[in-house]
Amino acid sequence: MEITTIDTKSKLKLNKEIFAYTYNEGLVHQAVVTFMNNARSGNSAQKTRSEVSGGGKKPWNQKGTGRARAGTIRSPLWRSGGVTFASKKRDYSQKLNKKMYKRALRSIISELCRTGNLVVVSDFQCDNHKTKDFLKKMNQMEISNALIIMSEVGENEYLGSRNLIDYDICDVTTIDPVSLLRFEKVVVTEAAIKKIEEQLQ
């Protein structure tokens, strides 16, 4: 299996086991859900009437005042009272076996390859850290929305792209299913292709 680099027009041989893998929609969905759930902090929490400070003494007598009866100033009906159905901290993390995760990444990368959304370049380097120059480089390739995968992310490439919503840049060790699916194109360098093959083997 071969792919042509868009800059030098040279042929690059690809591993069929990685770039021509059968698409498994169920596994990809599971990997995406697991990744997104593991990113959740789960810190949302409120206090119930039993946890709010104060409220031990009955505010006024049960009878004789003409007011509605009240047993505590920390009732959920009161200002500064507890929350009726208070949410608590919870752990949203899920487990996905390494083999399953690798197969999900193979499925996504192979589908990108089949649909023509995987773009290979011989190298990707910016002369400086300016966003304007980074955009100019992407416009020359006629790519308006992309994830760029490099073997190692340089400082100029990182600084030039970090303020842009339509582009993201990462190295091979930090690729994830959500980023691979979020962008229209995935631009990969030749050096990164070799590392991806080693990592997903």
Curated annotation (Swiss-Prot):
Pfam families found in the cross-reference section: Ribosomal_L4
One GO term of the biological process aspect: translation
Annotated organism of origin: Legionella pneumophila (strain Corby)
Family per similarity comment: Belongs to the universal ribosomal protein uL4 family.
One annotated Gene Ontology cellular component of this protein: ribonucleoprotein complex
Protein name as catalogued: Large ribosomal subunit protein uL4
SUPFAM superfamilies in alphabetical order: Ribosomal protein L4 (SSF52166)
Role played: One of the primary rRNA binding proteins, this protein initially binds near the 5'-end of the 23S rRNA. It is important during the early stages of 50S assembly. It makes multiple contacts with different domains of the 23S rRNA in the assembled 50S subunit and ribosome.
Region (Disordered): 42-67
Classification via InterPro entries: Ribosomal_uL4, Ribosomal_uL4-like, Ribosomal_uL4_dom_sf
Assembly mode: Part of the 50S ribosomal subunit.
Keyword list, A-Z: Ribonucleoprotein, Ribosomal protein, RNA-binding, rRNA-binding
GO molecular function: rRNA binding; structural constituent of ribosome
